[in-house]
Structure formats: structure tokens, C-alpha cells
A protein has these predicted regions:
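Feature captures the catalytic cores and cofactor-binding loops of soluble hydro-lyases/lyases
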Residues: 1-176
Length: 176
């Protein structure tokens, strides 16, 4: 199937919770809820924060789910149709970084594609204007993580960890 809708973009779970019920967003049944900045670099550990429900006005009308897209993970308890683990994530310049609220999106399940419906010129202009977000680390471990983690498309693992896959083959130094 092919699906089209209008993107409503949130900059992480805090932004989603603050604005989901904002009537100025004009969220209706034809919208895709998008959350970005929640992948392994943007939200170390890539927490399960893509779970999103429609605004209260739609819930009262019986609309209990809208399609969601995110560069992070989601709990298995979410009933919404979802595209998760979008890679590369927005924090490193992936496609979701260029998406704006109001943009039209086309999802083609048969072709396995998700496309923003803007001109190539507009897409190029957005890419040229994009700059990485300033991410503040709360611990040295977050900094190490952000500087060495791969994307969810490759497992979200520390890239340097592949050098240590066979540590059991070498006898460690004696520490006594």
C-alpha cells in the first residue's frame, strides 16, 4: 500500500508532550506524527520514546492511533502503525533532520520507501542550511557513547567494540 499524509514534527518526547494538544498544529486523521532527535546519538541509549498517541480532540472522536515515524525505538505496547529506527538519525543529519511540520510524506510499503514530497531544490536548500544540534553530555560516558556509537541500522553498537569481540582468546595480564 501507499500512504500519504502531512508531517507533524516533534523535537523529542518533551516537545511532543508540550505540543500534542496545540490546536494550531491542526492535527487530523491524515497526519503522521514524527519524533526526531531520539536515536543513539541524539538520545543516548535510544530510549523507547517514539510511542505517541493522537491529541485529545481526536481521541474523544474515537481516533485512537495515528501513524508514527521516529529515529528512535518504541515499546511493543504501542498500537500505532510505525516506522522506527530511521537511520541515519536526525542528530547526525539523516532525512528526518530536513523534515518540517506541514510537509507531505509518502510511504510506499511495497517499494520500502518513505519520501518527503518537496522539490529537489528545496531539499538541497534545507540540507545546505542544516547544522548539527548542540548536544550537551551529562556524563563522560554519554560523551564516549555519542562519539563512538553507530546508527540503529547497524545495531546502535559502539563502533570500536568490534575490535574486542575475541577477548577470551588472549590470556589477560596477571594483576597480582
Amino acid at each position: 500500500g501507499v500512504f500519504e499524509g502531512r508531517a507533524i514534527v516533534f523535537e523529542g518526547p518533551e516537545d511532543y508532550h508540550d505540543r500534542i494538544n496545540d490546536p494550531d498544529l491542526g492535527i487530523d486523521e491524515a497526519c503522521f506524527l514524527v519524533i526526531r532527535g531520539v536515536g543513539p546519538v541524539g538520545y543516548p541509549g535510544s530510549a523507547e520514546v517514539v510511542n505517541m498517541q493522537p491529541p485529545d480532540a481526536l481521541l474523544r472522536r474515537g481516533v485512537i492511533e495515528l501513524p508514527t515515524i521516529g529515529d528512535g525505538r518504541q515499546s511493543g505496547t504501542s498500537g500505532s502503525p510505525s516506522i522506527l529506527n530511521a537511520s541515519p538519525e536526525a542528530a547526525v543529519g539523516g532525512g528526518l533532520a530536513l523534515l518540517e511540520t506541514g510537509d507531505r510524506i509518502r510511504i510506499d510499503l511495497n517499494a520500502g520507501t518513505a519520501n518527503i514530497l518537496i522539490s529537489d531544490e528545496e531539499l538541497s536548500a534545507r540540507r545546505a542550511a542544516w547544522s548539527p544540534p548542540k548536544l550537551e553530555n551529562q556524563t563522560p560516558w554519554q560523551e564516549i557513547h555519542r562519539n563512538t556509537v553507530g546508527q540503529l541500522s547497524t545495531g546502535g553498537c559502539l563502533e570500536l567494540a568490534t575490535r574486542y569481540q575475541r577477548v577470551g582468546e588472549i590470556v589477560p595480564r596477571n594483576n597480582h
